[in-house]
């Protein structure tokens, strides 16, 4: 039974993020990008104000949108040096706190990473577990998958990486 008759029981949010790759080709074995909290070896770096984790940025944006709290750019603007090089875990945890303050918990999330390279699926399970642990929900409630743009556009030319996320938030009792 809904104890808050003016609040919807379910809220859905959609998030999207994109970052450009640095054109420099790095041969260092320690070169990596971070996607959904997991470091993946890759010969290019992401150009970003924070750590450039498109997966966590999209999920953060989805959560904020679901509970009517604006966007990641409003809360953590790339014009503020407070957020320079910060790990995106912080953004996600703060978004979850804002959802809880509004009386909502995260029920489940689905994240799609869009890129030609690096290959995401070998890391998807680890990403799901990482996110679930970060926001304290069952790993079965997080899904990470990947797709390409069939070599079309800037993503197809391997100039960047994108992510979209959808989240279901439920009213807490």
Curated annotation (Swiss-Prot):
Keywords: Isoprene biosynthesis, Lyase, Metal-binding
Pathway: Isoprenoid biosynthesis; isopentenyl diphosphate biosynthesis via DXP pathway; isopentenyl diphosphate from 1-deoxy-D-xylulose 5-phosphate: step 4/6
Named cofactor requirement(s): a divalent metal cation
EC number from the UniProt entry: 4.6.1.12
Coiled coil: none
Site (Transition state stabilizer): residue numbering on this chain: 49, 148
Positions annotated to bind a divalent metal cation: 17, 19, 57
One Gene Ontology term of the molecular function aspect: metal ion binding
Residues binding 4-CDP-2-C-methyl-D-erythritol 2-phosphate: 17-19, 49-50, 76-80, 147-150, 154, 157
HAMAP family: IspF (MF_00107)
Oligomeric form and interacting partners: Homotrimer.
Protein name per UniProt: 2-C-methyl-D-erythritol 2,4-cyclodiphosphate synthase
Gene, per the UniProt record: ispF
